[in-house]
Design a protein with these regions (language model features):
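Bacterial N-terminal signal peptides that target proteins for export
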Residues: 1-9
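Bacterial N-terminal signal peptides
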Residues: 8-16
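Sec/Tat signal peptide C-region and signal peptidase I cleavage site
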Residues: 16-22
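Extracytoplasmic copper-binding redox domains, predominantly the cupredoxin/blue-copper superfamily
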Residues: 22-187
Length: 187
């Protein structure tokens, strides 16, 4: 092998290693947690807000049963709350202790929900690189084809504003206002 060929091969290997090193894997746990004094437990992603870079992967880990990680996408017959050009994605129901991974390549703001637990508030926001896209708008449709029930309140919580996620790098479920986690009582 010539010196030029060896040098080219070494540079290619270094470039591949640099790209691989720049990509990060983040962990989001999927929980059901009993709450003292309440009949219904809390269903949530932790963290509930996350800043990542394009090319990063998120491992969604089921710590309790019957969770999915599903994009709010028009092709799922839901409000479209992911950047333009993002295909619809959803995990299957992830068994307890198992992981489902998704690599985010398109910059912008992604709203994600758990299929079985959306009505309990199990939604989250991921900012990939820079905020942008339809998820930057407040949730206004709280119907089953919008952002259903408590999940809309969760995504409208001020702690999940993209600017907050960018400033903090991540937002814990416990940083949300407790009023964002329950349906308001109707008179």
């Amino acid at each position: 092998m010539s010196t030029t060929a060896r040098l080219s091969l070494m540079l290619a290997i270094v470039a591949v290693m640099a790209v691989a090193a720049a990509q990060t894997t983040h962990v989001v746990d999927m929980h059901i947690t009993p709450v003292e004094g309440q009949p219904t437990p809390e269903f949530y992603f932790e963290p509930v807000g996350l800043l990542i870079e394009p090319g990063d992967t998120v491992d969604f880990v089921a710590l309790s049963p019957h969770h999915t990680a599903t994009a709010y996408h028009a092709q799922h017959v839901k409000s479209h709350r992911v950047p333009d050009g993002v295909e619809p994605f959803s995990s299957p129901i992830v068994p307890v202790g198992e992981v489902w991974s998704y690599t985010f390549t398109i910059p912008g703001t992604y709203d994600i929900w758990c299929g079985p637990h959306e009505h309990y508030g199990m939604a989250m926001r991921i900012v990939v690189g820079e905020p942008g896209g339809p998820a930057e708008e407040p949730v206004t449709d709280f119907s089953p084809v919008g952002v259903y029930a408590i999940s809309g309140l969760v995504l409208n919580d001020p702690a999940l504003a993209s600017s907050e996620i960018v400033a903090r790098g991540g937002v814990s479920w416990y940083d949300l206002d407790p009023a964002s986690k329950v349906m308001p009582e109707t008179p």
